[in-house]
């Protein structure tokens, strides 16, 4: 977050590296940068953890704030699962796919601004997608956004059918 008495760029920029999956995030940020990590959060914390991570992003951005996110392709998940037995087990349980992530972020109130870059070096050829937070503060994500709040249907996520 920018301090209220900040000077001009570059002294008004603060970087914070932290594990959002452990503990709470109380600060409000103008920009959240997520590079090469959605796959690892998804594999280690499952579908529920990924949705919780996205909810924390929405709650942690100032109104109108930006998240720039590199969403790894499903193929890279298959490569990662070979690293350990626990990742293979986790991989087999995942229902959310990378192609679903934009839809989930938009459902949580974010606006997709589209891709801004396509990496071409060192084996990374992934786009960085940009999302903008709603113009008003999100106080809390409604309970209906806890997992499971969607059912996987043929190549889509859809709200559960009322019973």
Q: Residue locations for each model-derived region?
A:
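S-adenosyl-L-methionine
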Residues: 1-23
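A short SAM/SAH-binding and catalytic strip from SAM-dependent methyltransferases
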Residues: 30-47
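Short catalytic/ligand-binding loop motif for oxyanion handling, primarily in non-cytosolic enzymes
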Residues: 40-43, 75-80
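A short glycine-rich, Lys/Arg-flanked "PGG" loop and its adjoining helix->strand segment in the class I
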Residues: 49-63
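Conserved Class I S-adenosyl-L-methionine
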Residues: 80-116, 121-123, 142
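Core SAM-dependent methyltransferase catalytic element
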Residues: 114-160
């Amino acid at each position: 977050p920018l301090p209220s008495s900040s000077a001009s760029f570059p002294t008004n920029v603060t970087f914070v590296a932290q594990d959002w999956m452990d503990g709470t995030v109380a600060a409000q940020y103008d920009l959240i940068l997520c590079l090469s990590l959605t796959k690892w959060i998804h594999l280690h914390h499952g579908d529920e953890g990924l949705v919780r991570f996205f909810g924390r992003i929405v709650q942690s951005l100032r109104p109108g704030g930006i998240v720039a996110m590199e969403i790894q392709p499903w193929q890279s998940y298959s490569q990662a699962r070979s690293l350990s037995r626990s990742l293979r087990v986790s991989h087999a349980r995942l229902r959310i796919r990378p192609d679903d992530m934009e839809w989930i972020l938009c459902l949580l109130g974010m606006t997709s601004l589209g891709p801004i870059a396509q990496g071409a070096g060192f084996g990374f050829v992934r786009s960085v997608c940009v999302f903008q937070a709603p113009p008003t503060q999100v106080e809390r994500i409604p309970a209906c956004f806890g997992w499971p709040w969607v059912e996987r249907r043929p190549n889509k996520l859809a709200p559960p059918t009322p019973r």
